[in-house]
Amino acid sequence: MDVFSADWPGICRRIVAEQRAIFAATASSEERTVYEGVGEGGDHTLAIDRRCEDAVFAELEALAAQGASFVAVSEERGEVSFGSGGETRVVIDPIDGSLNARRTIPSHSLSIAVASGPSMADVEFGFVHDFGADEGLLLRWHRS
């Protein structure tokens, strides 16, 4: 399966639904300020960050099970190859605005970019969901 022919709108909707459930289950600042380990970038990882990233990776694993090959790049896990890896990159930030999410300030988002190569200039699909406004933006670039 080609990564770019995947149902990215559906994938993103499922991730948003799972993350909403995670935020609802950890509604207080105390529940959201639990640390667990250190991420790939060297920062301490909030449990809520890890759980939201797990929701993204569950969808990526399902995509790989359908035969897609790509490399996921995340703050917590670093680079993770799926299938044969290759040039395609899926760049994720499961909680952009972790401090706000931790403080239960509804100004944080989910960001996903899918690129045909190693550079952000290679991005062909992008998605951002703002949990405060509960709005998402999905873009596809068509190169000529």
Q: What function would you assign to each model-found segment?
A:
Residues 85-143:
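DPxDG-like acidic metal-binding loop motif
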Residues 1-92:
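N-terminal subdomain of lithium-sensitive/metallo-dependent phosphomonoesterases centered on the IMPase/IPPase/PAP
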